[in-house]
Regions:
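DEDD superfamily 3′-5′ metal-dependent exonuclease/proofreading module
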Residues: 1-214
């Protein structure tokens, strides 16, 4: 598996200016307010991972440094992965609103390292899933923006032509056997993925983050 570069940004909410950067790649770390230094650092990685990278970090970077093309990177978002892999209880590294639990506020290096911990916990949780459930998640989610990067990293682009049948076989009587499942697969794969994750752990004990329910 290829190495992943983890990072975080501190953004001024008043003007969108990025004040500070933190990063971790293999054994190297970065903590700087210098944008050019940050850009040089992330060139080391093909896969970029941050907590809420899709809706926070990348949009902030694109606004602050619009001449840089971030599309060449494959993005992995631990915000979306966490409730998929840990639906049964509040994840211990996350606090209210699924922000990262760190020792210092507004320290992007600490947040980048916390993201790294979250990612490897997610990776370990995924690796112990039954193979059939891995294939269901890959087939359902690997072409969505929220999960595409993760499955590219895992080199898992499995796409089943009989996904409905595979879901029904794996979950059995835990889910309703009706034709609406095909519509959910086609139109709401992410929502269905989260629902299946909850069902898989006997959903009465699950805790779903508020942002997922929205």
């Amino acid at each position: 598996m290829e190495s992943v570069l983890f990072f975080d940004t501190e953004v001024d909410p008043k003007n969108g200016r990025i004040l500070d950067y933190g990063g971790s790649f293999e054994e190297k770390i970065l903590h700087t307010g210098d944008t050019n230094e940050f850009l040089k650092f992330i060139q080391k990685g093909k896969f970029l991972c941050a907590h809420n990278i899709l809706l926070h970090d990348i949009p902030a970077l694109q606004k602050f440094i619009p001449d840089v093309d971030f599309s060449k990177y494959t993005l992995i978002d631990t915000l979306h992965l966490s409730p998929l892999m840990f639906p049964q209880k509040p994840y211990h590294r996350l606090i209210k609103d699924d922000k990262l639990q760190t020792d210092q506020i507004n320290n992007p290096l600490n947040d980048a390292l916390a993201t790294k911990d979250v990612f490897y916990d997610v990776l370990a949780a995924f690796d112990i899933l039954p193979n059939s459930l891995k294939e269901i998640f890959a087939s359902l989610l690997s072409r969505t923006s929220q999960f595409e990067g993760f499955f590219k990293l895992k080199n898992n682009n499995y796409k089943s032509s009989k996904l409905k049948e595979e879901i029904l076989e794996f979950f059995g009587e835990k889910i309703c056997h009706n034709k609406e499942l095909e519509e959910l697969i086609d139109k709401s794969p992410v929502e269905l993925g989260y629902a299946l994750a909850i069902i898989n752990v006997n959903g009465s004990k699950s805790v779903t983050p508020p942002w997922v329910l929205k």
